[in-house]
Regions:
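Structural motif corresponding to alpha-helix initiation and N-cap regions
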Residues: 53-57, 83, 134, 170, ...
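N-terminal, active-site-proximal structural segment of metallo-dependent hydrolase catalytic domains
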Residues: 3, 16-88, 106, 272-275
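Structured beta-strand-rich core segments of catalytic domains in phosphoester-bond hydrolases
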Residues: 70-156, 255-256
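Surface-exposed cleft-lining segments at the edges of enzyme active sites
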Residues: 43-48, 123-130, 155-167, 196
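Sec-dependent N-terminal signal peptides
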Residues: 4-13
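Metal-dependent phosphoester-hydrolase catalytic domains
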Residues: 178-187, 194-275
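Active-site beta-strand/loop signature of hydrolases that rely on acidic residues for catalysis
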Residues: 28-34, 59-83, 112, 140, ...
Length: 275
């Protein structure tokens, strides 16, 4: 028996399975598509100035309840109120550093992070070549306890029913994979718009669209196609957190007090030593 145990141990070392990743630190991350702070009414920037302080308090209460170190926001709007008198970055994200991408119609991606947990190394905005909407990804490279991690926030196309654009979303997913294929630590979050959409008809969920990421070696937070967009019936699994080289646990889907038409996704990310 002793020889058998020794033989198994040697085989395990030879295969590399004896190498154990050591957690250097962990951070709380949240992805949320805020629908331009529309108070769950599914319109753009519908909060009047008179309601600004009251509504900001509701958003802050929710954000504080999650207490994320890093927050990725899709469908962001710097104007929290309709007249722009209140700015979201100062009204909602006090204590966070910000990196906000360009606003292109309904598309605007932003990443907020606490300086006590992370420091920015680099950032970039990359627009997708194949698109109907002005879709892009915002990427910020953060130093977390000495480990560089790319955080990517994106919103993919939904108009793949249009002639000439049927493969746009597929190509956008491939672009994300290719651009971060050689990076050891990556967290990609966003509204991926998975599903078959035809105007005037119910959307057909298609969580299998995420398979391309798994085949490329990424992990999914929304592994079982949990619906995150309750406006649709059936509910669509639009939102996800997709990662590699980073551990994930404690995944939760949060209704966020109906402050958006999307659920938020929060999780614990484990940052490991080395590559």
């Amino acid at each position: 028996m002793r020889n058998i145990i020794f033989a198994v141990a040697v085989a395990c070392v030879a295969a590399g399975c004896a190498t154990k990743q050591v957690e250097r630190t962990s951070v709380r991350f949240m992805h949320w598509s805020v629908s331009h702070f529309s108070d769950g009414t599914y319109s753009v920037a519908s909060i009047p100035e008179s309601e600004g302080k009251r509504m900001a308090a509701k958003y802050v209460k929710f954000l504080n309840s999650v207490d994320a170190d890093i927050v990725g926001i899709t469908e962001y709007n710097e104007d929290f109120t309709t007249n722009g008198s209140m700015k979201a970055s100062t009204a909602l994200f006090k204590g966070y550093e910000k990196s906000v991408g360009p606003a292109k119609g309904d598309v605007c991606n932003a990443i907020f992070y606490k300086s006590a947990k992370a420091a920015k190394i680099d950032e970039k905005d990359v627009f997708f070549e194949n698109h109907f909407e002005d879709t892009y990804y915002k990427a910020v490279k953060l130093n977390i306890s000495g480990v560089p991690v790319w955080f990517v926030q994106t919103h993919l196309d939904s108009n793949t029913y249009l002639s000439g654009h049927r493969r746009d979303r597929e190509e956008q997913m491939k672009k994300l994979i290719e651009d971060f294929r050689n990076e050891p630590h990556v967290v990609i979050a966003g509204d991926f718009r998975v599903g078959v959409r035809i105007p005037g008809k119910p959307c057909f969920p298609a969580p299998e669209e995420y398979d391309v990421f798994e085949k490329a070696g990424f992990e999914l937070a929304n592994l079982f196609g949990t619906g995150t967009y309750p406006v649709d019936s059936p509910i669509q699994p639009l939102d996800n957190i997709i990662l590699k080289g980073v551990g994930i646990s404690e995944v939760r889907f949060l209704e966020a007090d109906h402050l958006s038409d999307h659920l938020a996704i929060s999780c614990k990310l484990s940052i490991y030593d080395g590559e």
